[in-house]
């Protein structure tokens, strides 16, 4: 890259010189005859037997920058303590020493080279400015350090390339003694337009036809090398391309900004009034909170209190299962409970369910978020219930008792029984939330496809213990303890009026009783489809929610309030008993 930059600079200066000569010829036509006459007289004098004094053309040869100087300049620019912006005169004074003098033109040439390589950004002096120094405005330390590391390798590559070029020139010129010429540095002034014009004039004045042909071939070979290097330089990203990329990034930022409608939907579901949750203290107990702080009083966050019984051995540490332990009456490990005053417990009670405005909204996408219909449920065996009497729903959620080959405190369904459930009749357009675990993940995906749903998302429930830490000793899992559960989200038809992008697909919540899913899923579904009819399958008493109809064999009787559903239920089951059909 160093040789390429030097040749391009030399080529640029020679082009400028040729342009000046052409302009002078246009202004003074007699100068052309003078130059031609001087060429003819020179050729006539060369034919005389006496010694002729031939003045060589005064072509300014620019020596390439010293590699050591380039390395020193890279090291100077890569210093983190360098104050920017700085000019080329200041850099020249810093690098100039008595042992190795440095010229201002070399420093400017190297700075322009580094700018072309996108190592630094420079600003050239204006035409009207009296200063001729180049201003360095910013540097890329990462690229500079990479260039310093690869300096040794690049020098070895340059030496090898120079030797290859010399060998190639010798092959192009041939081995005839009459045409031998002293070796010159590769890819220098021989590729310039001035040298090419001089060689053409010499050939036309009677200098040997064979030598001119071979010199022309050599010029073509070297010109091809220069063309390749110029092409590699032109392939770098231009200022216009960089500006276009910057505009694209700004457009992407604008597209990622939420619109006024999205902000309005988020504001609609924002919690009103005081906060309904309290934050736990990171230190656990009040004693540890006081010891870690500078104040004699604990913080206002929620703390835990140790439960120390007669059989408790504090040296054993905390129980792995904490408040989910099955043997708390005899467990020797330490357990915890919430440490809060009695008045705080009374204030923590939320508003009564009866205070909510009641109303049934069966239209998908109803914006009346605050209107809720009372909870309804039916105690039954879902395999035998004719679910067509319940109508259509916008959202269906199911937590099936999968047969996962474990000892569970409830009955399970076989894989075939799960596949035969009449889920498709519950929806024409909407969403299905299906909880799966263990080997049931693949079976759940199969059931989604069988029931006519396309899986579009998957919610992860990360389980935490009573102390709000990730559990490490779960009771599920064969090879690894399971610390999470999955909820597959399927879509059917073309649902309209649902809110997109309000929640993420991760729930972090505390573990409670067996198969007790987090209550956060209900808020997530309500924000997705506010005010619509929803149904939950395989529910238990703690799953009963407003706007939901819950089906399960552990519920308390039958509680229906929707007049249309009540009429269809009485017509289908006059005696109120849901029994197994005779054809099953």
From Swiss-Prot:
Site description Interaction with METTL14, residues in chain: 442, 445
Region (Gate loop 2): 511-519
Keywords noted in UniProt: Cytoplasm, Differentiation, DNA damage, Methyltransferase, Nucleus, RNA-binding, S-adenosyl-L-methionine, Spermatogenesis, Transferase
Compositional bias ranges of the Polar residues kind: 187-204
Entry EC no(s): 2.1.1.348
Gene Ontology molecular function: mRNA (2'-O-methyladenosine-N6-)-methyltransferase activity; mRNA binding; mRNA m(6)A methyltransferase activity; protein heterodimerization activity; RNA methyltransferase activity; S-adenosyl-L-methionine binding
Cystine crosslinks: none
Domain of life: Eukaryota
Substrates-to-products reaction catalysed: an adenosine in mRNA + S-adenosyl-L-methionine = an N(6)-methyladenosine in mRNA + S-adenosyl-L-homocysteine + H(+)
Tissue specificity comment: Expressed in the hemato-vascular system: enriched in sorted endothelial cells and haemogenic endothelium.
Motif Nuclear localization signal location, chain numbering: 213-220
Binding residues annotated for S-adenosyl-L-methionine, in chain numbering: 381-382, 399, 517, 540-543, 553-554
Positively charged region required for RNA-binding, as annotated region: 469-482
Residue span of region Interphase loop: 466-483
GO BP annotations, alphabetical order: cellular response to UV; DNA damage response; endothelial to hematopoietic transition; flagellated sperm motility; forebrain radial glial cell differentiation; gliogenesis; hematopoietic stem cell proliferation; mRNA destabilization
Positions of the UniProt region annotated as Interaction with METTL14: 454-458, 468-484
InterPro entries: MT-A70, MT-A70-like, SAM-dependent_MTases_sf
Subcellular location: Nucleus; Nucleus speckle; Cytoplasm
Description of the deletion phenotype: Lethality 10 days post-fertilization (dpf) due to severe hematopoietic defects. Levels of N6-methyladenosine (m6A)-containing mRNAs are significantly decreased and emergence of hematopoietic stem cells is blocked.
A cellular component annotation (GO) from this entry: RNA N6-methyladenosine methyltransferase complex
Subunit structure: Heterodimer; heterodimerizes with mettl14 to form an antiparallel heterodimer that constitutes an active methyltransferase. Component of the WMM complex, a N6-methyltransferase complex composed of a catalytic subcomplex, named MAC, and of an associated subcomplex, named MACOM. The MAC subcomplex is composed of mettl3 and mettl14.
Entries under PANTHER family matching the protein: N6-ADENOSINE-METHYLTRANSFERASE, N6-ADENOSINE-METHYLTRANSFERASE CATALYTIC SUBUNIT
Domain comment quoted from the record: Gate loop 1 and gate loop 2 regions are adjacent to the S-adenosyl-L-homocysteine-binding site and display large conformational changes upon ligand-binding. They may play an important role in adenosine recognition. The interface loop contributes to the heterodimer interaction.
Protein family per UniProt: Belongs to the MT-A70-like family.
Job description of the protein: The METTL3-METTL14 heterodimer forms a N6-methyltransferase complex that methylates adenosine residues at the N(6) position of some RNAs and regulates various processes such as the circadian clock, differentiation of embryonic and hematopoietic stem cells, cortical neurogenesis, response to DNA damage, differentiation of T-cells and primary miRNA processing. In the heterodimer formed with mettl14, mettl3 constitutes the catalytic core.
This protein's name: N(6)-adenosine-methyltransferase subunit METTL3
């Amino acid at each position: 890259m160093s040789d390429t930059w030097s040749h391009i600079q030399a080529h640029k200066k020679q082009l400028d010189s040729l342009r000046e000569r052409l302009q002078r010829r246009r202004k003074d036509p007699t100068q052309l005859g003078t130059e031609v006459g001087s060429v003819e007289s020179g050729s006539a004098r060369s034919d005389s037997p006496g010694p002729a004094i031939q003045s060589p053309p005064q072509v300014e040869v620019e020596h390439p920058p010293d590699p050591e100087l380039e390395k020193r300049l890279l090291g100077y620019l890569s210093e983190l303590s360098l104050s920017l912006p700085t000019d080329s005169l200041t850099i020249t004074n810093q690098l100039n020493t008595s042992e190795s003098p440095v010229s201002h033109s070399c420093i400017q040439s190297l700075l322009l080279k580094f700018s072309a390589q996108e190592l630094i950004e420079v600003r050239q002096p204006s035409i009207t400015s009296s200063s001729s120094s180049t201003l360095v405005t910013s540097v890329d330390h990462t690229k500079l350090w990479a260039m310093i590391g690869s300096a040794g390798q690049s020098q070895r590559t340059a030496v090898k390339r120079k030797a290859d070029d010399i060998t190639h020139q010798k092959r192009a010129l041939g081995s005839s003694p009459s045409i031998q010429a002293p070796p010159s540095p590769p890819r220098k002034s021989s590729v310039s337009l001035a040298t090419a014009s001089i060689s053409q004039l010499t050939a036309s004045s009677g200098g040997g036809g064979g030598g001119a042909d071979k010199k022309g071939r050599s010029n073509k070979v070297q010109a091809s090398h220069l063309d390749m290097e110029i092409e590699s330089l032109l392939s770098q990203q231009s200022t216009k391309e960089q500006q276009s990329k910057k505009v694209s990034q700004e457009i992407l930022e604008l597209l990622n900004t939420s619109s006024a409608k999205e902000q309005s939907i988020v504001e609609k579901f924002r919690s009103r009034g005081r906060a309904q949750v309290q934050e736990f203290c990171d230190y656990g107990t009040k004693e540890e909170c006081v010891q870690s702080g500078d104040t004699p009083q604990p913080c206002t966050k929620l703390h835990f209190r140790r439960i120390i019984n007669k059989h408790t051995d504090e040296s054993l540490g905390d129980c792995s299962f904490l408040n989910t332990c099955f043997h708390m009456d005899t467990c020797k490990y330490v357990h915890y409970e919430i440490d809060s005053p009695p008045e705080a417990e009374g204030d923590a009670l939320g508003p009564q369910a009866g205070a909510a405005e009641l109303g049934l909204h069966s239209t998908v996408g109803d914006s009346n978020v605050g209107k809720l219909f009372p909870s309804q449920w039916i105690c039954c065996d879902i395999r035998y219930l004719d679910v067509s009497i319940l109508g259509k729903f916008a959202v269906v959620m199911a937590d099936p008792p999968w047969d996962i080959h474990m000892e569970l405190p409830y009955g399970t369904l076989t894989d075939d029984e799960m596949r035969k459930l009449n889920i498709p009749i519950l929806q024409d357009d909407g969403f299905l939330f299906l909880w799966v675990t263990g080997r049931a993940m693949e079976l759940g995906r199969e059931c989604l496809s069988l029931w006519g749903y396309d899986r579009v998302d998957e919610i992860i429930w990360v389980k935490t213990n009573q102390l709000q830490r990730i559990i490490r000793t779960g009771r599920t899992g064969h090879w690894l303890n399971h610390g999470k559960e999955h909820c597959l989200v399927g879509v059917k038809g073309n649902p309209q009026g649902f809110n997109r992008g309000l929640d993420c697909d991760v729930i972090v919540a505390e573990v409670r009783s067996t198969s007790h899913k987090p209550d956060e899923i209900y808020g997530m579904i309500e924000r997705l489809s506010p005010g619509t009819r929803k149904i939950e399958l395989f529910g238990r008493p703690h799953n009963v929610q407003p706007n939901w109809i819950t089906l399960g064999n552990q519920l308390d009787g039958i509680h229906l309030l929707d007049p249309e559903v009540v009429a269809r239920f009485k017509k289908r089951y006059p005696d109120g008993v849901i029994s197994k059909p005779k054809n099953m």
